[in-house]
């Protein structure tokens, strides 16, 4: 009897304690799950915490435009980046009808692809190609079509699915581009290039038409900061980050022979440093909690190789800085599986080995050469391709220097050609002049190619120095007289402007 009374008293006492403690403001006590596991892992009896729904989440449509501006298996990484971005956005709830994809689509089924029909963007990554819509592929991946799509102008689109950003004043737009670039230009697999001022004018026109509420733009390319430096307005409700500043390269990563390395059967880089940084950040955080600013900071640290800038670049930002306070889900969507992920936590400070964007093509060709059978015709052909590519690079470099000597004299040429304007200044005063000088050069000396895009600042400086069209023609003819451009003649490659 006494034992029964004691047990009853003890039980009532425990219940009293539990009832009392549940009302005390003791941090972490009973109010928390006391989950000993990592964030994002729940016990079977637990339910995910409800996510607050913002008013903004009920208004407007999220749009995305994804652009891979290259072609060829050596540029595998650009299409891998874009396919990965598509999968991320779809998991975030963006509808296929609101995501428009530009990619040449010559990678997945390429004879050099060791995994036919599959594209990966990480050494241990899953296929990111499956389900990606073929909106604008092959010859339809052009700057002109991109402009028409952004403006929602169906009548101006040539080929492709015909999808355009038919957005309304309360909609949000996310634009992501990955490819080669140069001062003032972004590459396209079908020439001409995208020129900065043309692109900015399209953005201004979209804003003037009330075509969106806010826009976020991410750009992966060499010298990508030059696309916006000095010409990006702050009053058009657009926030931009770029993989590099106006003067430096961006970087390929997950490359053969480097760490982290792709699976051994791959001969090409799987991704780009800035691109994998933002996507892997988005996949590991709750985008209802993480802000645009937090992602910018994380990506900036990782792309700089953790502030060493040893084979890293300076991630830059332009446009309306107030957008940085917005939560990322407003542009990239929200994956319910990430509900208990942290809002942001830095990756381990593990520098990644990378290759300069402009050298990635040679790195790829060298991998093919090393893996070819000794003495085979294939090995000889690849070696000749490498020699031809290096020879054309050398020709471009020496021709530009000689043209400078002819225009300004040997003593002044280098200083003028390599001149860099003050931060905040546009690359060139007359963008029409820039295009004209590029066409004159390519007519005489051959196509710039992905490598030669680096000389765009030289052309800009020639324009800024007041050189006439006639003087440029005379200098180019003298510098490249007798040169046979062969496969790199603009009649084969097209003009870059």
Swiss-Prot record:
Superkingdom per UniProt: Eukaryota
Site feature (Required for post-translational maturation and enzyme activity) residues: 269
BP term (GO), one: proteolysis involved in protein catabolic process
Catalytic residues in the record: 180, 222
Record keywords: Disulfide bond, Glycoprotein, Hydrolase, Protease, Signal, Thiol protease
Matches recorded under Gene3D superfamilies: 1.10.132.130, 3.40.50.1460
Physiological role: Asparagine-specific endopeptidase involved in the processing of vacuolar seed protein precursors into the mature forms.
This protein's name: Vacuolar-processing enzyme
């Amino acid at each position: 009897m006494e034992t029964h009374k004691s047990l009853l008293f003890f039980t009532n006492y425990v219940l009293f304690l539990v009832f009392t403690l549940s009302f005390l403001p003791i941090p972490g006590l009973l109010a928390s799950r006391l989950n000993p596991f990592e964030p994002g892992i729940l016990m079977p009896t637990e339910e995910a915490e409800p996510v607050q729904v913002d008013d903004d989440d009920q208004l407007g449509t999220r749009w995305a435009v994804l652009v891979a501006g290259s072609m060829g298996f050596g540029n595998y990484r650009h299409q891998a980046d874009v396919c990965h971005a598509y999968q991320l956005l779809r998991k975030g709830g963006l509808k296929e009808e609101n995501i428009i994809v530009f990619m040449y689509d010559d990678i997945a089924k390429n004879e050099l692809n060791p995994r036919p029909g599959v594209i990966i963007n990480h050494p241990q990554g899953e296929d990111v190609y499956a389900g990606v819509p073929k909106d604008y592929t092959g010859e339809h991946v052009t700057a002109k079509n991109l402009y028409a799509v952004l403006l929602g102008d169906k009548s101006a689109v040539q080929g492709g699915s015909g999808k355009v950003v038919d957005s309304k004043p309360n909609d949000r737009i996310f634009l992501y581009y990955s490819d080669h670039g140069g001062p003032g230009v972004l590459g396209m697999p079908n020439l001409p290039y995208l020129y900065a001022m043309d692109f900015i004018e399209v953005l201004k026109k979209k804003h003037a038409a009330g075509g969106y509420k806010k826009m976020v733009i991410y750009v992966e390319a060499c010298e990508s900061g030059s696309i916006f430096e000095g010409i990006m307005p702050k009053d058009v409700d657009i926030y931009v980050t770029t993989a590099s500043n106006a003067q430096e390269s961006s970087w390929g990563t997950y490359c053969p022979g480097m760490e982290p390395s792709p699976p051994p059967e791959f001969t090409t880089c799987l991704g780009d440093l800035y691109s994998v940084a933002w996507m892997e950040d988005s996949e590991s955080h709750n985008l209802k909690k993480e802000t645009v600013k937090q992602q910018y900071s994380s990506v900036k640290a990782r792309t700089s190789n953790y502030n060493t800038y040893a084979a890293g670049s300076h991630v830059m930002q332009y446009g309306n800085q107030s957008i940085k306070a917005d939560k990322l889900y407003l542009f990239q969507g929200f994956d319910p599986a990430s509900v208990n992920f942290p809002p942001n936590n830095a990756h381990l400070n593990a520098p990644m080995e990378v290759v300069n964007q402009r050298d990635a093509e040679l790195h790829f060709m060298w991998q093919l050469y090393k893996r070819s059978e000794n003495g085979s015709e294939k090995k000889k052909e690849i070696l000749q391709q490498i020699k031809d590519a290096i020879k054309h690079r050398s020709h471009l470099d020496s021709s530009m220097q000689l043209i400078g000597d002819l225009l300004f004299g040997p003593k002044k040429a280098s200083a003028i050609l390599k001149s860099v304007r003050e931060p905040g200044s546009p690359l060139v005063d007359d963008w029409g002049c820039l295009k004209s000088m590029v066409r004159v050069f390519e007519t005489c000396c051959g196509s710039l190619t992905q490598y030669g895009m680096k000389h765009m600042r030289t052309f800009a400086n020639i324009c800024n120095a007041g050189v006439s069209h006639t003087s440029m023609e005379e200098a180019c003819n003298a510098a490249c007289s007798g040169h046979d451009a062969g496969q790199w003649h603009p009649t084969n490659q097209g003009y870059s402007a």
